[in-house]
Amino acid sequence: MEQFGDATTNPKGLPTALIKDVAECYAGATPSTKVAAYWDNATIPWMSSGEVHNGRVSATEKKISQAGYDSCSTKMVPANSVVIALAGQGKTRGTVAITEIELCTNQSLCCIIPNSSVMSDYLYYHLKLRYEEIRNLAGIAEGRGGLNLKLIQGIRVLVPSKVDQEEFVAFARQSDKSKFAVQNFSNLNLWGSL
């Protein structure tokens, strides 16, 4: 966020908004695992909270059937939406991902569908960089260990111009590619030394 300064103190005086003002937010649900018809021969991608660690979600480990979808309150999440883990073990809570496909989710994920003022990729990287801050919101909420929709909707985000959002996303993507290249190189060196 160096380009814009600290998101909390906003030293550059950029426009800001609460997530609830720039996006629709909702959580998913889980069909009963006791009803085989909800999970057998299923075609609807269904994302669990652990899958946020994939960063970009182009496939899900599980799928549900139309009957399973109809049996619960989960909703379809469009491609290019941001999801954030509300709960989870280890580092899961507060982790952010972006969907590359249409899918539905379990109740431990907040689905964030940005409006036209905020690019999905911008919001993804913006929230990803604020992981610790977001994760710590759970401790503020009456001593509970999880996040909730109200907390996520109340996060204030910087809303720079679309041009600045695009520049930020281009830089963040390049940084991701560089980290991936370094990791792959390290893995090659480790394997080569065996």
Language-model segments: residues:
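Non-catalytic DNA-recognition/assembly elements of restriction-modification systems
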Residues: 1-30, 154, 158, 162-194
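Low-complexity, Lys/Gly-biased intrinsically disordered segments
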Residues: 12-54, 70-72, 148
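Basic, amphipathic alpha-helical recognition segments used for DNA target recognition
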Residues: 18-24, 53-59, 75-79, 98-102, ...
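Short, surface-exposed beta-edge/turn micro-motifs
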Residues: 43-44, 79-82, 107-109
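Short, structured beta-strand/loop micro-motifs enriched in basic residues and often containing a Trp
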Residues: 59-68
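Short, Lys/Arg- and Gly-enriched loop/turn segments at beta-strand edges
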Residues: 91-98
